[in-house]
Amino acid sequence: FELSARGRSEMVICSKVRGLEVELITNVFASRRRVAWLLGADEAELHKAFQERATKPLKLRVVPDGPVLEVVEEGEEVNLHCLPLIKHFKHDRAPYITSGIIISEDPETGVGNMSYHRSMVHSNTELATSLHSRGHLWRLLNMVAERGEHLPVAMVIGGHPLFMLAAAARVGADVDERDIAGGLFGEPLEVIRTPHYGIGVPATADFVLEGIIDPQARAEEGPFGEFSGYSSDRSTNNVLRVERILRRRDSVLLDVAGGNSPDHLNLARIPRESEMAQKLKERFPDV
């Protein structure tokens, strides 16, 4: 926020942070020019470059191994309190995962869904998370709830910035955002299958939490500093039970600055404005 107030947007890398054993990287998306560079475009053409690539998805590629499988913790080894997390604002209830992307797969079609959900540690093996946007993940959770089942999921913490942008794209339930990521990369996203539920996650991710969301379980979370610039305790209070943690040996904490920071807003804004520009172009060709 201090950088933003001074009109600066540098990516921040902190090698030593009190309470963390890994490097902290944040403010990645604060610069539109930096995101445009990732797409090989000028800043003025950012929305066009994103849309051109996102509308040419490439099917993910499953690989047998990857750095994210270098360390696997399960059973009594799982302790979410050991995750490198930071508290973003004074009134946040606890340290939060702000960059966590929950990946689920439709039990009927196998199509994957990626979405962001703020999450805080509730116990050694449970995250309290909010699905208050009520998107595709909410639909899938209700689908399995009607069957009396749980929803297998994998939360990715720390991925390539283009993968993170793909997770923020607004697409139909029949479109797999992992394929959108492939379109943004210009080559298929390489994924490994998680050990138990077989969910495709980036082979190079820093951390992956594999487990289930129990449709019936609840745990309070919030307040948390939201994009509106206000602290909000609006939440569905869902519970993600983590059964195993996968991580790289050289993992880092890739954090998204909370609140109404440029980092946070651009992550959501760039895919959204690209979609809107395309729809305006279809309706008004001269725009």
Question: In which residue ranges do the predicted regions lie?
Answer:
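Extended, highly charged
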Residues: 1-224, 229-239, 244-287
